[in-house]
UniProtKB/Swiss-Prot annotation:
Localization in the cell: Plastid, Chloroplast
InterPro entries (UniProt xref): Ribosomal_uL14, Ribosomal_uL14_bac-type, Ribosomal_uL14_CS, Ribosomal_uL14_sf
Function comment: Binds to 23S rRNA.
Superkingdom in the source lineage: Eukaryota
CC terms in the record's Gene Ontology section: chloroplast; cytosolic large ribosomal subunit
Gene3D superfamilies: Ribosomal protein L14
Gene Ontology BP term (one): translation
Similarity comment: family membership: Belongs to the universal ribosomal protein uL14 family.
Protein name, as recorded: Large ribosomal subunit protein uL14c
Subunit structure: Part of the 50S ribosomal subunit.
Entry keywords, A to Z: Chloroplast, Plastid, Ribonucleoprotein, Ribosomal protein, RNA-binding, rRNA-binding
Length: 122
C-alpha cells in the first residue's frame, strides 16, 4: 500500500532512483495505491546527466508492493520492496528497460508495454 509521503524505488532506467508519492490517482476517495495503480510522485534521488532531475514531478505506476495483493484463486503475491515505473501522460514508460519482476495484474490494467519490457512476470 503506497500512500502520500511513501518512498518507492524506481524499476526502470529513466534516470530516477527514488520517488516520493504525493498523490494517488484513479479515484478521489482512495487513500492508498497498490500494484497497477497510478501515482504522482516527486523525484528524490536521480542519476547524474539523465533526463529526470531531482525535484521533477512525474507520473508512475506501481509494479511491486511489499503489502501484496490477493488473487482470485486465493494466492497472495508480495514483494521485498515497493517499486514503480515512470510513465508519461499516455501511460507508456519513459525508460527503455524495466528491472526486476513485475506482477501479472499490470496486464489486466492495460500496461502491456511495461509487462513486455519486464524480465519476469509473476
Amino acid at each position: 500500500m503506497i500512500q502520500p509521503q511513501t518512498y518507492v524505488n524506481v524499476a526502470d532506467n529513466s534516470g530516477a532512483r527514488k520517488l516520493m508519492c504525493i498523490r494517488v490517482l484513479d479515484a478521489s476517495f482512495k487513500q492508498s495505491a497498490n500494484i497497477g495503480d497510478t501515482i504522482i510522485a516527486v523525484v528524490k534521488e536521480a542519476i547524474p546527466n539523465m533526463p529526470l532531475k531531482k525535484s521533477d514531478i512525474v507520473r508512475a505506476v506501481i509494479v511491486r508492493s511489499a503489502k501484496g495483493i490477493r488473487r482470485p484463486d486465493g494466492t497472495i503475491i508480495r514483494f521485498d520492496d515497493n517499486a514503480a515505473v515512470v510513465i508519461n501522460k499516455e501511460g507508456n514508460p519513459r525508460g527503455t528497460r524495466v528491472f526486476g519482476p513485475v506482477a501479472r495484474e499490470l496486464r489486466e490494467r492495460e500496461f502491456t508495454k511495461i509487462v513486455s519490457l519486464a524480465p519476469e512476470v509473476l
